[in-house]
């Protein structure tokens, strides 16, 4: 009975907060801005973003308002990712999460204590609308891994762009479990949807982002973690009273490099990373590109690989042009030759023994032999003359 009362009281507080936000939460929000302006004024939220265009980094920054991005998971990484894209002026955001804000989340970024009890997508939407009312938001408070919700999730990423009926430009995975990652992977492979995956380790000191283009790069099932490859139920790995570590610093770094990769991909500047890792212990950022697995367990991935091969074969082949190096001073009118100061016999004598190596392997250099009983040449002659006599001779020179 006590639990039921506590649940009802929490629900009442949640409804009161929603009512308060609906009444006055947006009163101080600025008016919508129809077009981005490079004008440098205190009231222009886009002036510093438009400076990227003036400095030659981005050709057409205003294009960002035409893009739609779906974010699955609005937790430590996803909420900060949504905030960054909102501040950058993205056209539309689709947010998917079924969890609620808890006080245990306060060690992370974005959410505030007074939002405890609200669903993450609702709390995020209220905050993000106040940050930038120019962005359109569509939120879904459900678990995408259930059958019905999965079908709806696929429908929204296929038809939920700014222009209804068009697919989103990018899907971002910011979830914290393999089941949800595999659900996103399955949907994107079936639809041919480009997406980016992100994650933070359980010890909170490393993370990664990965760009996945179906058929062109490895999907999440091509090289799955052990927990997926061995068909282990990850729920059995969690114990009562035990949770993963969480640092706002690591999550902020991962969210930052994820959004940076998103901006480079959408606005076509810089080099887009297929995989970028982060090791906080050594400040190490490894990068790599992973090719798809021809024996991938996902049949849609294998199908996308075949489609990509056909597409590549249809592209006209570009012939590589090899330029011959020009010979400088080909004519040697003066008969100049390069002569070594060391003869071959002297070189062999100075070289160390050549080790016994297999056929085809040679050494770049050998260790010189150590000559024994070497004495330095005498450069100082002994004399019975005094120091004063020697100084007098020096003055007379």
UniProtKB/Swiss-Prot annotation:
Annotated positions binding Zn(2+): 219, 222, 296, 301
One GO process term, biological-process aspect: protein ufmylation
Catalytic residue list: 243
Subcellular location: Cytoplasm; Nucleus; Endoplasmic reticulum membrane; Golgi apparatus
Binding site for ATP: 76, 97, 120, 143, 177
Record region (Linker): 340-370
Membrane listed as a keyword: yes
Quaternary data: Homodimer; homodimerization is required for UFM1 activation. Interacts (via UIS motif) with UFM1; binds UFM1 via a trans-binding mechanism in which UFM1 interacts with distinct sites in both subunits of the UBA5 homodimer. Interacts (via C-terminus) with UFC1.
Protein family membership: Belongs to the ubiquitin-activating E1 family. UBA5 subfamily.
Domain text: The UFC1-binding sequence (UFC) motif mediates interaction with UFC1.
Protein name: Ubiquitin-like modifier-activating enzyme 5
Species assigned in the record: Gallus gallus
Lineage: Eukaryota, Metazoa, Chordata, Craniata, Vertebrata
Gene that specifies this protein: UBA5
């Amino acid at each position: 009975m006590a639990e039921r009362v506590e649940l009802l009281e929490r629900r009442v507080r949640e409804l009161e907060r929603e009512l308060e936000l609906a009444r006055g939460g947006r009163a101080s929000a600025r008016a919508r801005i129809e077009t981005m302006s490079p004008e440098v004024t205190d009231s222009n939220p886009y002036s510093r973003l438009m400076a990227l265009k003036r400095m030659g980094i981005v050709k057409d920054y205003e294009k960002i308002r035409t893009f739609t991005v779906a974010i699955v998971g609005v937790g430590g990484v996803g909420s900060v990712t949504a905030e960054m894209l909102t501040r950058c002026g993205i056209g539309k955001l689709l947010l998917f999460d079924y969890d609620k804000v808890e006080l245990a989340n306060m060690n992370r970024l974005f959410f505030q204590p007074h939002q405890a009890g609200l669903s993450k997508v609702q709390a995020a939407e209220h905050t993000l609308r106040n940050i930038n009312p120019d962005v359109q938001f569509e939120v879904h408070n459900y678990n995408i891994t259930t059958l019905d919700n999965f079908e709806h999730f696929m429908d929204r990423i296929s038809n939920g762009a700014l222009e209804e009926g068009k697919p989103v430009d990018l899907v971002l995975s910011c979830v914290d479990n393999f089941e949800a990652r595999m659900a996103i992977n399955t949907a994107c492979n079936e639809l041919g949807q480009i997406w980016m995956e992100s994650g933070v380790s359980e010890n909170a000191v490393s993370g990664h982002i990965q760009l996945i283009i179906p058929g062109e790069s490895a999907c999440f099932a091509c090289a799955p973690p052990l927990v997926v490859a061995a068909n282990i139920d990850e729920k059995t790995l969690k114990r009562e009273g035990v949770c993963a570590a969480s640092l706002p610093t690591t999550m902020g770094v991962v969210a930052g490099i994820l959004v940076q990769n998103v901006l480079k991909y959408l606005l076509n500047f810089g080099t887009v990373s297929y995989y970028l890792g982060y090791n906080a212990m050594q400040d190490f950022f490894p990068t790599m590109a992973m090719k798809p697995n021809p024996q991938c367990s996902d049949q849609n991935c294998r199908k996308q690989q075949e489609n990509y091969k056909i597409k590549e074969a249809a592209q006209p082949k570009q012939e590589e042009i090899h330029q011959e190096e020009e010979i400088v001073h080909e004519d040697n009118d003066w008969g100049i030759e390069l002569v070594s100061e060391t003869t071959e016999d002297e070189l062999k004598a100075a070289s160390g023994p050549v080790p016994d190596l297999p056929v085809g392997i040679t050494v770049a250099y050998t260790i010189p032999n150590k000559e024994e009983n070497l004495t330095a040449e005498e450069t100082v002659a002994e004399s019975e003359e005094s120091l004063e006599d020697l100084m007098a001779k020096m003055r007379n020179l």
